[in-house]
C-alpha cells in the first residue's frame, strides 16, 4: 500500500506509509540521539513529551521502512505556521533511527527520489535544522538545500530546497 521507490536490486526497498501506533512507539525507543537533541533544541521539549501528540495524530505521520525495518518517521505539509514558517511549497520533517546506517546508500537514493517527486508538485521544501546536527546538515546539503541563519536563535538555520 505504501509508496515504493525501487533501485535496480529490489532486495532493499524503501516504503513510506501512514504510521501505526506500534511504529511510533518503536521509533521512540530507537530515535538517533542527535535527532532527539534537535527536537528538544527546536521545540524546547524532549522527544518523549511529543509522543502523546504523535500518537493522537498518527494519521499525519509517515513511517519510512526498508524491507520492514523502521528507518524513521516524517511527513510534509503544504503550509504550516509553526516556528513562524510559511511556504507556498511544503514544510518537510523527518527523524531517523539508528537503523538508517544499515541502509544508508538506499536511503540516500530514496531521499533524492522523494525530493524530486515533491519538487514536481511544489516549488520548494523548507523547515529548520539545528546547525550542530552535522549529519542532518550534510544530508540536507546532499539534497540541495540552501541555509539561512536565524537572526534570533543561535545554531538554528532555516533551509530551503528549491525546484531547479
Predicted segments with their positions:
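Conserved beta-strand-loop-alpha-helix junction that forms the acyl-donor binding cleft
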Residues: 121, 125-141, 151-153
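C-terminal "cap" of GNAT-fold acetyltransferases
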Residues: 153-164
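Conserved beta-strand in the GNAT
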Residues: 63, 68-85, 91
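Conserved acetyl-CoA binding element of GNAT-fold acetyltransferases
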Residues: 85-101, 157
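Active-site rim helix/loop that mediates acceptor-substrate recognition in acyltransferases
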Residues: 39-60
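Conserved acetyl-CoA-binding loop-helix of GNAT-fold acetyltransferases
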Residues: 103-117, 138, 142
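Short amphipathic alpha-helix that is part of the acyltransferase structural core
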Residues: 3-45
